[in-house]
């Protein structure tokens, strides 16, 4: 976590930021992207929200703060990230956030949610149809699911570490996929 504290903005958001003419620095870009994600997901205070793949908690903590009557459940595959998020939530007095440590391929819950949000996590998953079926089972009747992924304009490909130059596959997306616009 020390490395990320040095190179990321104050929210520790390691997915894309939002930049327009009014944005002057990384902190503003992170804040704008978090706000835009919540707007695109049509989040309302009081909803039960599930975040799939929460990283260092940028969106989880932002939602817990800005939607204090909502119950935020976030899933991370990292015990160190869960501990980091729990510590920040406690320090900020946020009691409406629960972080679960689990691989997304194995995650199950009996809870149902009004909103499910996933930011740049599906690139780590190879069997999207299985996870889409799970997501559908976790949704209430009028729920919404926001999935934010980066993708290649034309060609999908797997992140595979074939040689030393394949640093993305080796260090960031081992076993993942670059989806395409047509996938």
Task: Specify the residue positions occupied by each region the protein language model found.
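A short glycine-rich, Lys/Arg-flanked "PGG" loop and its adjoining helix->strand segment in the class I
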Residues: 129-142
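A short acidic, Gly/Pro-enriched loop at the edge of an enzyme's catalytic core
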Residues: 105-116
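Conserved SAM-binding loop of SAM-dependent methyltransferases across substrates and taxa
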Residues: 56-68
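Conserved beta-strand signature within the Rossmann-like core of class I S-adenosyl-L-methionine
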Residues: 142-150
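Conserved SAM-binding strand-loop segment of SAM-dependent methyltransferases
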Residues: 91-104
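Short, glycine-/aromatic-enriched active-site segment of Class I SAM-dependent methyltransferases
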Residues: 152-174
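Conserved class I S-adenosyl-L-methionine
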Residues: 46-55
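Conserved Class I S-adenosyl-L-methionine-dependent methyltransferase catalytic core
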Residues: 1-40
